[in-house]
Amino acid sequence: MITNTYQYMTDMHGFLQRVASAQRRSNIVKFRLGPKKIYMVSGEKNIHAINTPSHSISPEVFFLDVMANVWGAKPTELVKFRQDKSGRRKNPIPGHELPPGEPRLWHGQHHIYSEFLQRTDRANFLTTKYFDLFSDRLVQQPLNEWREVRLCEFFESEMAEAALEALMGPRLVELNPGFWPMMWEFARIAPQLMWGLPRWMNPGPWKTQAEFQAMCRRYIDAAAKAFDPTGPEADAEWEPQYGSRMARELVKWATENLSPETTAGMVATFIFGTNANSVPMSTWALMHLVADPALYRAVRDECLAASTTDTVTGRRGFDPQKLFGMPLLQSVYIETLRLHVSINVTREVTQPITLDGFLLTPGSLIQAPSQIGQYNEGVWSAPGHPASEFWGYRNLKRESEKPEFTMTGKTSSFFPFGGGPSICPGRVFAKQEILMTIAALVTRFEIELIDWIHPDGIKSNRPAQNDQSLIGAVGIPPDRDMKVRWKRLW
């Protein structure tokens, strides 16, 4: 038990390798994390079961841990969430209706994401806003001049700032000198906060958390003073104080239901969640393309076929519907997430339930590690292309004259955004953001690989690999940078 607990908390990569080995004999592996029984599950039927709404399994335990340890929610706030068993849907779960006047907390938050982030028209608006901001940054690169660039540095500054402004407006950066170094440090330590270790054991992450949340508090307070809820921008899809309508509605919901400190913690976690996934995935996707010039050219041809030019302004862009439907681009996107997103989807057993012949008792936890399914050779391997390696064409069906994108037979082994009622609400925007980013770069630039380098700039003797310290918690950034030379063509 001590070995399992210690390895689970300090070496998730090694622990998941042990689980994968054990799951060759059984789809369910039990271990103890301290006093808690945890069942690691795989297999199509089991994944379907934990992602299907059920009175026997609840996804809320993970979010309560995030609220407690990453947001920094107060005990009284956590009690209110625990007591709200009315569910996330429009109508309360029968038998769990709340008294009149009591807010349905899970439903309220879910409604904000569903209405203002997931809805097609609003996701498209945010994507367009992001693309315009990102394009404005790209045109600042010298035209027809070769320049050396570090890809990780580029994405962590230019892409991240465009995405942040699209979602949250410009004020976070304007109000907080040193915002980006602090944000990326918070992204690095957020998984450590999840374990809930006492401050005296590891004070560094708590200090970073407090400093980053203070930055977010400045943004919230400044926006509250500057924004007029009765003015002409009351229903605007974007304005400079809060940024997007989604951010404004989310902060409004939080200020009505949470303390100012917890509201700042929620905003900090939202910022981390958006940037710490889409930015490293875009970085990885371009790294894979640059490392394979033939694949780079093939993806560029697809993106050029979806490009457009405004007849009035001459501004170039893309037909989103056409771009997002390009088969090879979609295959590269899926392959990138398959290899570089590692999360443990977590559920709590609330009533006795049987999976694969095992009786799981209330209070137990179920975890489905996405990495195990996404590296399953039986599902993903192809002749000459093992599941452990990147192959951009892996998700194409080639029987027809034109390649077709397909995920047939793979969906239960691919869940980088989680699943069920707690699936990541930002997945639509994230996908469109990543695809637009790659399309903009491969069509606008000639890019050539120079070297793989360490973060300090020293040449590396190998390509980048997943940063193993973040496995199991997030989109995994590369542990090396890629130095390239590029030239902007237009």
Residue ranges of model-derived segments:
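Cytochrome P450 catalytic core segment centered on helix I
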Residues: W184-T255
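Cytochrome P450 heme-binding "Cys pocket" and the immediately downstream C-terminal segment
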Residues: L295, K410, P421, R427-I471
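Central I-helix of cytochrome P450 enzymes
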Residues: A247-E302, Q367, G426, I434
